[in-house]
Amino acid sequence: MSILQILHFPDDRLRKIASPVKKMDDQIRQIADDMLETMYQAEGIGLAATQVNIHQRIIVIDVSEDRHQPLILINPELLEKSGETGIEEGCLSIPGEKAFIPRAKEITIQALNREGRSFRLSADDLLAICIQHEMDHLIGKLFVDYLSPFKRQRIQKKMEKLQKINEKKDK
């Protein structure tokens, strides 16, 4: 398994729309495994393939307290949503930033699992929020897109400044 590099906002590659996975094979399973390892190492609860510059519809999530209940979603589709909720969301692609984002409280999705079998999942609370957040990544949408232009621009400038500092450290 490998740790993958997580792209950071405002990297344009985060805006690419992910393509459906056409065939479940060992390569896709390896990508999902590497994504899980990357997510755990970064102490995140979800990661979309877009965030690691792989533009396929793959999401990994683990919102369990013991961090031993990974969920792999291949080609997820939102079937139903209801209610309203929201929390202060963070994102591995926008480190150090959080914002309250409105989301559906309950959702039902359909996806393929690691073996390529189709399944339905009904989720609420944190799992529902996390799935919606990660599915946004698959269409090139970030949580900052829900914010006012002023707040989004402030975060973008902060991230660009951080990127320049990190580039100087790497030299």
Swiss-Prot record:
EC number: 3.5.1.88
Cited SUPFAM superfamilies: Peptide deformylase
Primary enzyme class: hydrolase
Co-factor binding comment: Binds 1 Fe(2+) ion.
Reactions performed catalytically: N-terminal N-formyl-L-methionyl-[peptide] + H2O = N-terminal L-methionyl-[peptide] + formate
CDD domains: Pep_deformylase
Residue spans crossing the bilayer: none
Entry keyword set: Hydrolase, Iron, Metal-binding, Protein biosynthesis
Biological processes annotated in GO: co-translational protein modification; translation
Cross-referenced InterPro entries: Peptide_deformylase (IPR023635), Peptide_deformylase_sf (IPR036821)
GO molecular function: metal ion binding; peptide deformylase activity
Cofactor(s) needed for function: Fe(2+)
Similarity field: Belongs to the polypeptide deformylase family.
HAMAP family: Pep_deformylase
Name under which the protein is recorded: Peptide deformylase
Species name: Hamiltonella defensa subsp. Acyrthosiphon pisum (strain 5AT)
The gene coding this protein: def
